[in-house]
Amino acid sequence: MLELLVASLSLALAFFALLDGWYLVRVPCAVLRARLLQPRVRDLLAEQRYAGRVLPSDLDLLLHMNNARYLREADVARAAHLTRCGVLGALRDLNAHTVLAASCARYRRSLRLFEPFEVHTRLQGWDDRAFYLEARFVSLRDGFVCALLRFRQHVLGTSPDRVVQHLCKRRVEPPELPEDLKHWISYNETSSQLLRAESGLSDRKDQ
């Protein structure tokens, strides 16, 4: 019995010391919770909220939430969002998947230790290759938007149009993208062209 306990503790220690343990636990838990315990969201464009709180492990040297933690929290919230609106299920049905192809973050005010917040995630639209999502970090103390993150979720194995059609059982036209999002997409395309030219891969497209 003692040997089993020692082995279990050793495995747990190795899991959290050698791997990003909490992330590997939280994302599947968020997906399972969204799938089994939360109601389905039928409106693809509806905003969803994911609650969080700044913990000591989230802090940087200035005692603010570490910039990288915003991306992680948004990752967990995005997984739950795509589960509840059915996108992950549709991708599975179509033998397809998505990868994160681009992201950007704008930080407006720091989140401090033990400050409660919500991640407001919404799908802004899609094109022939990717879904575009926005995540807002809203302080529950005063409702201030502390950070705004944007993501390009590239679809592999099918197209966003087919995913949406599979979900809605009909053809759905993508919504008009916001002007600032169009500028960001244009920036990504220009950056890709420059990098391909530098690498001599001008005929190859990025994800």
UniProtKB/Swiss-Prot annotation:
UniProt keyword list: Glycoprotein, Phosphoprotein, Secreted, Signal
Residues with PTM Phosphoserine: S199
Family matches, as CDD domains: 4HBT
Residues in the signal sequence: 1-21
Keyword Transcription regulation carried by entry: no
Pfam families: 4HBT_2 (PF13279)
GO cellular component terms attached to this protein's record: extracellular region
Gene3D superfamilies, per database record: Hotdog Thioesterase
Compartments where found: Secreted
Disulfide bonds: none
Glycosylation sites recorded in the entry for this protein: N188
Annotated InterPro entries: HotDog_dom_sf, THEM6_lcsJ_thioesterase
UniProt keyword annotation of 4Fe-4S present: no
Entries under PANTHER family matching the protein: PROTEIN THEM6, PTHR12475
Membership in a protein family: Belongs to the THEM6 family.
Protein name per the record: Protein THEM6
Species the sequence originates in: Mus musculus (Mouse)
Upper lineage: Eukaryota, Metazoa, Chordata, Craniata, Vertebrata
